UniProtKB/Swiss-Prot annotation:
Residues 369-378 have a biased composition (Acidic residues). It holds the Pfam family CID. Keywords: Acetylation, Methylation, Phosphoprotein. Associates with the RNA polymerase II complex. The modification Phosphothreonine is found at residues 358, 482, 517, 598, 723, 732, 763. Residues 352-368, 379-394, 1417-1434 have a biased composition (Basic and acidic residues). This is Regulation of nuclear pre-mRNA domain-containing protein 2. GO terms for molecular function: RNA polymerase II C-terminal domain binding; RNA polymerase II complex binding.
Amino acid sequence: MAAGGGGGSSKASSSSASSAGALESSLDRKFQSVTNTMESIQGLSSWCIENKKHHSTIVYHWMKWLRRSAYPHRLNLFYLANDVIQNCKRKNAIIFRESFADVLPEAAALVKDPSVSKSVERIFKIWEDRNVYPEEMIVALREALSTTFKTQKQLKENLNKQPNKQWKKSQTSTNPKAALKSKIVAEFRSQALIEELLLYKRSEDQIELKEKQLSTMRVDVCSTETLKCLKDKTGGKKFSKEFEEASSKLEEFVNGLDKQVKNGPSLTEALENAGIFYEAQYKEVKVVANAYKTFANRVNNLKKKLDQLKSTLPDPEESPVPSPSMDAPSPTGSESPFQGMGGEESQSPTMESEKSATPEPVTDNRDVEDMELSDVEDDGSKIIVEDRKEKPAEKSAVSTSVPTKPTENISKASSCTPVPVTMTATPPLPKPVNTSLSPSPALALPNLANVDLAKISSILSSLTSVMKNTGVSPASRPSPGTPTSPSNLTSGLKTPAPATTTSHNPLANILSKVEITPESILSALSKTQTQSAPALQGLSSLLQSVTGNPVPASEAASQSTSASPANTTVSTIKGRNLPSSAQPFIPKSFNYSPNSSTSEVSSTSASKASIGQSPGLPSTTFKLPSNSLGFTATHNTSPAAPPTEVTICQSSEVSKPKLESESTSPSLEMKIHNFLKGNPGFSGLNLNIPILSSLGSSAPSESHPSDFQRGPTSTSIDNIDGTPVRDERSGTPTQDEMMDKPTSSSVDTMSLLSKIISPGSSTPSSTRSPPPGRDESYPRELSNSVSTYRPFGLGSESPYKQPSDGMERPSSLMDSSQEKFYPDTSFQEDEDYRDFEYSGPPPSAMMNLEKKPAKSILKSSKLSDTTEYQPILSSYSHRAQEFGVKSAFPPSVRALLDSSENCDRLSSSPGLFGAFSVRGNEPGSDRSPSPSKNDSFFTPDSNHNSLSQSTTGHLSLPQKQYPDSPHPVPHRSLFSPQNTLAAPTGHPPTSGVEKVLASTISTTSTIEFKNMLKNASRKPSDDKHFGQAPSKGTPSDGVSLSNLTQPSLTATDQQQQEEHYRIETRVSSSCLDLPDSTEEKGAPIETLGYHSASNRRMSGEPIQTVESIRVPGKGNRGHGREASRVGWFDLSTSGSSFDNGPSSASELASLGGGGSGGLTGFKTAPYKERAPQFQESVGSFRSNSFNSTFEHHLPPSPLEHGTPFQREPVGPSSAPPVPPKDHGGIFSRDAPTHLPSVDLSNPFTKEAALAHAAPPPPPGEHSGIPFPTPPPPPPPGEHSSSGGSGVPFSTPPPPPPPVDHSGVVPFPAPPLAEHGVAGAVAVFPKDHSSLLQGTLAEHFGVLPGPRDHGGPTQRDLNGPGLSRVRESLTLPSHSLEHLGPPHGGGGGGGSNSSSGPPLGPSHRDTISRSGIILRSPRPDFRPREPFLSRDPFHSLKRPRPPFARGPPFFAPKRPFFPPRY
């Protein structure tokens, strides 16, 4: 690779050299900035493939950046490589596979981190499944992924020696497997197999015969004993003769066996091929069979519904529409022509006779030909279509006399449903017309021959009169179809010829449907017209005008082609004529307006459905497919059956359409007919059944196309066959149900679509993405539903937001990530998405969500459904982004956030916030530059793991450090668990999102928080679901997460929860207390060099009072804990607190403890302030730890605010899992109690706990004592490990806030891990004493579960989180114990240990400290920057990274405590 890279740049000419240099710099830039978004990866992948001549340079630089990058970014680079490797062959750049094969073993060794290894393993599995690389290569890569570095190097050497060559050789042998299979399936001929088997059978018989002959031989050729018995010459000669005979027979036998042995392999090969072929066939057949089953179910359901509706339908003559009564005569007139056409007997006989009389096969063939656009008919139909487009009236011009008559007939039929016979007659008329229209003149001729033109003319005239009576003008005809089948229109236009083929059927369908309502009849007519000859067109125009459905002439055509349109929508529909017929049902379920989903059927069906005639609708629906697919008869039959009244009309009418329909798809038709037959209401169907049989011959011709399309369709299950299945599964209303719903003609495709989409029904999505297949449609559905969801969960960007809006947040998460991966999860309960969100994404879902993004990215290019839903996801994510450009929040929240603090925040620390914000939006990491993508891909990867990384790696630098640093792995590990728990618990942890939040929390969180605020106010019930509605209401969004878990401990719990994110809850109230000036930057407390600085920072930081909060960013810091949390965890915690920020300014006050309200306010307003602060010192760090440090005096205010108290109460509530007091308060007790637990459970937790514990000294500050004796500053090196957010700025422990509440604790821990897990823990005790043990502990406690899980899920998260937190706390407890004083303060005391006051204030301070510590962890992420930042805080006992920079923000890794459920 290196050589290749060198070669690429070392060109002879200077120009080439300069170009190579430009290429390399461009490569560096591109590889450095690639994110985990599909757009970024696919765009860079395409660029690489286009520059394939520089493949060696590209791969070399890819490897270079893989080595340099943090784990999340490494995963992004792996996604990029995957995209290139999988697409290079298709794009004629296969060289990339070999180039990457050289470096992949080493690359695999660089992505062993648990946060990304799962995603990479998934990539390898895809390569294996798709034979991208040989199995040996994949095995080697997997080994590299799981081995140590030394063995990796050996592996790489071995692999470079052997596998690459082997791979190049075996590429032809392995890859061919799939190609061979497809070749076998394509070339398999059953006749050859039969011949081989017969040959074998013959040879077997021959051998058997020879065997028998040998057994009857008198001489035992093989025995020498007989020779001894020879005595005389005669006997010897006799024996010799017999022996020779026997030996010749034996020779023949042996030769026969040899022959069989030689022929055996070919036979076995043939049998193997047959096995492969028939297996493939079986799979396809199973899909079709299942589709038919679902279709049958749909038909049965529809029959039931139709039966119910039939009882409610008025008599045709009593139909509300006047047209029906007028139609009565028309049908009679129609009857004559129908009989003339060859259906003189009863309707069903007529149909049959018509089938026979009219060139049925021809008609069917013509239908097929129509699809192929025969010359003669093609011109006619094209003209007709154009005419229709231009003028409905002109259509009649095509066949002037006929069209007029049919139109009239149709009008009459539609106006008078009870005139089924007449109607039937009319359809035949249109049928001939259609035939003429159709490419097959033969059909037209026979039809015309059978039809009495005079009768047709009279019928048409009567129809026209009826139309006039109806008050519909032919001109308006085009409109009717439009609403009903907008989708079909396009398609329809495409396939006018087929439509023409089915024109007579459509007429019959129309007639049969007429009985339902004039509108439905009109709709049917318009369809028929489209398909029928000009006469039919005229009818359709008249009908359409009558219907009032705005269907342009082109629409009529489109309807006739609707099969095609439907097919376009349901591209497979057309192919599956049967399904097409089924589709009417499906489309209803899908599109709700069959016209769109189905082809023509769709259009008519839509009209009918809109009319609200259940029977008519089905009839129309069937008819449409029939028309489009040549199913008219079938559809008609089916429709006829549904409407009892219609059946009479339909019977004759259907019989005729069935002729065509028959040709379309006999089996489906038969099935439909059977279903209809089964239903007493479908008496007309029985008549149609004969047609079905007739259609059988005709149907096959269309059947093939239908099969052709059906295959994909069934596969997708999106349309027709597939759709029913998907719809049922998704709980989407069945077509029948859909039909029932849109009973009025008002139902149009658009409205139906919107309606469907809104509810998250699968119908629209499936309609939208029929090609991808059921999966796609499903995900799409999900997307749609999620999108509905999303407004609430726009905060997907920040898992923490979930804490604030536990439910909503997950929704957004789901929307962006989970939706992709867990469409059903997110989608399932669209309507209840908010409540459901939390529970909706089960832990696994969350995890999947986290993982899936990677998958989606991996798959986006390979899976249509993935791709389809991914775009949707991306669109949703985009939407989320739109909502929260800064973070994924609803626009309003976003606006709040943006206006108040988000802008500042983002502007002030674009690096931190921008990335985070971006990140938060999509999976939360897409937006972020590199960290964002890393995080995002953390999400896709082992999302849980990646969370921690995301959190830590969220910051670009930290991310890098992350992979390299000792704790990155452990951190990740911790994070992984945490994320796992958190993710499962709720979206908040969705590892990717959560990570994103870790960094993005500030922006994301803020926006999310705002979202939450909005949501909190608007969906308290959801919160209540989790028993946190009240809290949520108060804290608004900031507490949303915590609220979910802390109804009673709003302040404390929130802080705990938020602490996890931001530990700003307490700060909120403190913020309120503190004057704005303090809050502004708060007097930077001198103290702070240690965790106490963290505390201080909470208090000392510019504490944001309510007002401050209102002012984005200014006093955020000040909010006791919240301020602190915001300070360093602005992004992470902002989700809860920040979102609330603006709206929560007052809420903050209300929270008193700075609960979520304060948090929110703090986050929102402080966000700006804090962002700058962070930038000044360490970005987020600065807010928590620095502010604490600088604003020691501030802490008291926050404490005073009462946040401490609130916090305490909240803490206890939250703490139930843990000691409530400590939890609520500082977790000092909790911490002690749980510290060991944390230690044991999660080293990082420990660290986090320790880090949290470290903050206790600041608690003193936080509590009443602004400058409580600051505990000795934690060792500068250890501040990170110690986790004193404020103090450990130099190497602040990763902020736990990004993590779930429980994660919060872990977060600080990872930084410790960075410093050394053991050391961190140990240090923490030291630091703890100097830092705020209580704070850390409390932070952990606070953040642990409650915050994590807003709501049951949140609670779960909290519970687990708390458990984790407890563990964390336990560690901190230890630390606190080490610190003694901080923890000594009891719940509050823990926080204030150092200070001494352990009460509420202490609690608050603790939270603040925790926040600080959290910040600390972040700085750990980018310790160096923090060190720079520290300079400003050199006064701190322990230099802390100044908040100036985002590094602390970025640097702190949030412990990945998997939330405990």
